A protein has these predicted regions:
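Conserved glycine-rich cofactor-binding loop
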Residues: 34-35
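Substrate-binding pocket helix/loop in short-chain dehydrogenase/reductase
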Residues: 113-114, 118-126, 208, 219
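Active-site helix of classical SDR
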Residues: 137, 173, 181
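Alpha-helical segment proximal to the catalytic Tyr-Lys
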Residues: 142, 186-187, 247
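Residue(s) in the substrate-gating loop at a strand-loop-helix junction
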Residues: 157
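Short, small/polar-rich loop/turn modules that mediate ligand/substrate recognition or access, typified
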Residues: 189, 194, 249-251, 257
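A conserved structural motif in NAD(P)-dependent oxidoreductases
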Residues: 223-234, 245
């Protein structure tokens, strides 16, 4: 009798393992997901067991190299164009399945002091960094509501929290992303959808590492932990927020800046 009971337990565990192994993986879409912080997020999600798609709008060769190195599916469109987002999302879902996790990471800068900034510089940043979050989230939202599950994670910035001289366009857009998350979180909560924001500080991306050493040292001197952040540290925040363990967290802002700006 004991042997049979023990055998049943082994069979039951085997069945559970089989079911777990044959479950459909959750699908994650990362905008701007082939470079810098976005690439780290895409790779971390893939390593976490998600099926990942990454969008880009720029260097084809770099994106293809990223895809070849990681096996992550890549798609090219501009998040600033709503119709392109609708068509792109449809293609991703046809290829991979319905999107469960959306990481709005794509962003650009067009820095200028306000007395010199052009409307074009203002509009380009707002269209990508703020309107792009709407353009990507809106076509996915109803599907998440219907399935009663979703994770929307918006990558903002320390400069969306404190502002930055010479970045009135960028700061306004990134601040808008925070407000977007807080408002939409209230609409999604009862449907099992969480909406959160991550505000990175200065991260050791190629762009930051390319600035003159004297400038970089000046930046680091303002960071209490005494170093730049790593893209992988932002990616780990995303992994947590995307997980089932973060289901009680919504409308929140994770500040990851080494203590440079404490809210």
């Amino acid at each position: 009798m004991y042997w049979w009971g023990n055998g049943c337990r082994h069979v039951f565990r085997a069945i559970l393992t089989f079911i777990e192994g044959t479950k459909m993986k959750r699908i994650a879409l990362v905008t701007g997901g082939t470079r810098g912080i976005g690439a780290a997020i895409s790779s971390a999600l893939q390593h976490g067991g998600y099926t990942v798609a990454a969008t880009y709008f720029g260097d084809d060769e770099a994106a293809k190299n990223f895809s070849c190195d990681t096996g992550i599916s890549i798609y090219k469109w501009s998040v600033s164009d709503y119709d392109s987002c609708v068509m792109g999302i449809k293609k991703v879902e046809e290829d991979l399945g319905t999107i469960d996790i959306l990481v709005n990471n794509a962003g650009i800068t067009r820095d200028a002091m306000f007395h010199k900034i052009t409307f074009s510089q203002w509009k380009e940043v707002i269209d990508t960094n703020l309107n792009g979050v709407f353009n990507m989230t809106h076509p996915i939202w109803n599907g998440m509501r219907d399935r009663k599950f979703g994770r929307v994670i918006n990558i903002s910035s320390i400069n969306g929290q404190k502002g930055q001289m010479g970045q009135v366009n960028y700061s306004a857009a990134k601040s808008g992303d925070i407000g977007f998350s807080k408002a939409l979180a209230q609409e999604g909560a009862f449907k099992g959808i969480t909406v959160n924001t991550i505000c990175p500080g200065y991260i050791a991306t190629d762009m930051v590492k390319a600035v003159p050493e004297k400038v970089r040292d000046a930046i680091i001197s303002q960071i209490p932990v005494g170093r730049l952040g790593e893209a992988s540290e932002i990616a780990r925040c995303v992994i947590f927020l995307a997980s089932d363990q973060a289901g009680f967290i919504t409308g929140s802002t994770i500040t990851a800046n080494g203590g440079q700006y404490i809210v």
